[in-house]
Curated annotation (Swiss-Prot):
Its EC number(s): 2.1.2.3, 3.5.4.10
Cellular-component GO terms for this entry: cytosol
CDD domains from the UniProt entry: IMPCH (cd01421)
Family according to the record: Belongs to the PurH family.
Gene this protein is translated from: purH
Domain statement: The IMP cyclohydrolase activity resides in the N-terminal region.
InterPro entries to which the protein is assigned, alphabetical: AICAR_Tfase_dup_dom_sf, Cytidine_deaminase-like, MGS-like_dom, MGS-like_dom_sf, PurH-like
Origin superkingdom: Bacteria
Xref: HAMAP family: PurH (MF_00139)
Catalytic activity, as annotated: (6R)-10-formyltetrahydrofolate + 5-amino-1-(5-phospho-beta-D-ribosyl)imidazole-4-carboxamide = 5-formamido-1-(5-phospho-D-ribosyl)imidazole-4-carboxamide + (6S)-5,6,7,8-tetrahydrofolate; IMP + H2O = 5-formamido-1-(5-phospho-D-ribosyl)imidazole-4-carboxamide
Functional pathway: Purine metabolism; IMP biosynthesis via de novo pathway; 5-formamido-1-(5-phospho-D-ribosyl)imidazole-4-carboxamide from 5-amino-1-(5-phospho-D-ribosyl)imidazole-4-carboxamide (10-formyl THF route): step 1/1; Purine metabolism; IMP biosynthesis via de novo pathway; IMP from 5-formamido-1-(5-phospho-D-ribosyl)imidazole-4-carboxamide: step 1/1
Span of domain MGS-like: 1-144
Protein name, as recorded: Bifunctional purine biosynthesis protein PurH
The entry's keywords: Hydrolase, Multifunctional enzyme, Purine biosynthesis, Transferase
Length: 502
């Protein structure tokens, strides 16, 4: 009995050459719908699926391969005498190759289509064939990825068959794909349900690339892109430089998010996932120069994020020092020419502002899921005798936008749209306060990611010349800090929202 391949693909790249190869090895081709037509038009002798099933395609193509004569041929165990006798008694031909790729649900779910249109891209027959073939991988070669045509052809050419190891790997790839595919469909159908956190968490990501290493050189790593969301970090373009490292991905994410907190032109300079210079200005150049001048030491080897176009003048300043990555929504052509003189400088063009509404992190044996910290303040409540001026209030909100991105315990001191001092990652609140104030000469406001447990932060800030403070409030000793502020004649406002970052 001749071997037989069932081929039904949406993405037809490479399938003609693969089908021709199988025919050259005396394999019969069975196919469906558009794939049948495509192969036939290109001169191949192809058996249409309804010749096998003696049943026409129906329901606008929803039912094509869902038939016992197809699935028995896939699932029969070749060295099981009872199975093979059953096939023989019912004149069912075995299927030895299943080549299927799916309707493009991953792509279509992100397009501006009606709900019902997206539903039509949920593939049923394809996954059913793939799963059946993958279960019986000892006897059936299953291909769900066009990139695997080559290895299968090479093995058949060299050995006359596909190795057990390869068949097992191809089967594993099927179930890997199916879990992502089903997860994407589940998330799509449950997206508007009131239950924010379903009983089972289905995440659907596809590998963007392997990374040279992880956080450290002895750790392996890869980066995966969401199949459901076109966010900032899976749609950017690399205009210059090497591929991003693991640490680059994490740092760029924070630099881009921080810069996009602001309506005004903004720049965020960042090292080791921590802002070292943040400023707003009338344009990207002014914002960059302000951020740079605050700490020209720490910015060296850093990541720079902008929320506006980068011009030549700004580029000329940046190439004066060593930087790892520049991220911006747009670049002037002459700015790009300047930046490209640094061949290893990674220059990224971003097409999307931050979009994610959930944040996930793994712990040993579990995953934590929470809302992104996208809410800055609940309500501005002045709690001191003195009220902040309009200019101070602008700086207070500026400082709170920055402190969101600093590891807790975190303090930012600022003036005139410049983060002059940033202190973070400490186990008490007074140490980051002292760090920020030491660096932040001339600062007039102080922002804290969480409440003051004692009055010492307010005392230290007031003695250093701070005129206004912004913090969430909520300590049982809030009054102690309020009294200190009133004593020194400075203002303090509560926001109601804490911004811990771990």
């Amino acid at each position: 009995m001749k071997k037989r391949a069932l081929i039904s693909v949406f993405d037809k790249e490479g399938v003609l050459d693969f089908a021709k190869f199988l025919v050259s090895k005396d394999v019969e081709i069975v196919s469906t719908g558009g794939t049948y037509k495509y192969l036939k038009e290109n001169g191949l002798n192809v058996i249409e699926i309804n010749e096998v099933t003696d049943f026409p395609e129906m329901l606008d193509g929803r039912v094509k391969t869902l038939h016992p004569l197809v699935h028995a041929g896939i699932l029969a165990i070749r060295d099981n005498e009872e199975h093979m006798n059953t096939l023989k008694g019912r004149n069912i031909h075995t299927i030895d190759y299943v080549v299927v790729n799916l309707y493009p649900f991953f792509e279509k779910v992100k397009e501006d289509l009606e709900f019902e249109e997206k539903v039509e891209f949920i593939d049923i027959g394809g996954p059913t064939m793939l799963r059946a073939a993958a279960k019986n991988f000892q006897d059936v070669v299953v291909i769900s990825d066009k990139n695997d045509y080559k290895v299968v052809m090479e093995e058949i050419e060299a050995n006359g068959e596909t190795s057990y190891k390869t068949k097992k790997k191809l089967a594993g790839k099927v179930f890997n794909l199916m879990s992502a595919y089903d997860g994407a469909i589940s998330n799509f159908l449950l997206a508007d349900e009131e239950e924010e956190y379903p009983e089972y968490l289905s995440v659907s990501y596809k590998k963007m690339q392997s990374l040279r290493y992880g956080e450290n050189s002895h750790q392996t790593a890869a980066v995966y892109a969401s199949t459901m969301l076109d966010g900032a970090m899976n749609t950017f373009e690399t205009l210059n430089g090497k591929e991003l490292s693991y640490n680059n991905f994490k740092d760029v994410d924070i630099a881009w998010k921080c810069a996009n907190e602001f309506d005004e032109p903004a720049c965020c300079a960042l090292k080791h996932n921590t802002p070292c210079g943040v400023a707003i200005g009338k344009d990207s150049y002014e914002a960059y120069m302000k951020a740079y001048e605050v700490d020209p030491t720490s910015i060296f080897g850093g990541i720079i994020g902008f929320n506006r176009k980068v011009d030549k003048k700004t580029a000329e300043e940046m190439v004066k020092i060593f930087l790892e990555v520049i991220a911006a929504p747009e670049y002037d052509e002459d700015a790009l020419e300047v930046l490209k003189t640094k061949k290893n400088l990674r220059v990224l063009k971003f097409h999307n502002t931050p979009k994610a509404d959930k944040y996930m992190v793994t712990v040993d044996g579990a995953m934590l899921v929470q809302e992104e910290d996208n809410k800055l303040v609940e309500e501005i409540k002045v709690v001191t005798e003195k009220k902040p001026t309009d200019e101070e209030m602008k700086d207070l909100l500026f400082g709170m936008k920055v402190v969101k991105y600093v590891k807790s315990n975190a303090i930012v001191v600022a003036h005139n749209g410049i983060a002059l001092g940033i202190g973070g990652g400490q186990v008490n609140r007074i140490w980051p306060t002292e760090d920020a104030l030491k660096r932040g000469k001339g600062a007039t406001i102080l922002a804290s990611d969480a409440y003051f447990p004692f009055g010492d932060v307010a005392e230290t800030a007031a003695k250093a010349g701070i005129k206004a403070i912004i913090q969430p409030g909520g300590s049982i000793r809030d009054q102690e800090s309020i009294d200190v502020c009133n004593k020194y004649g400075i203002s303090m406002v509560f926001t109601g929202y804490r911004h811990f970052k771990h």
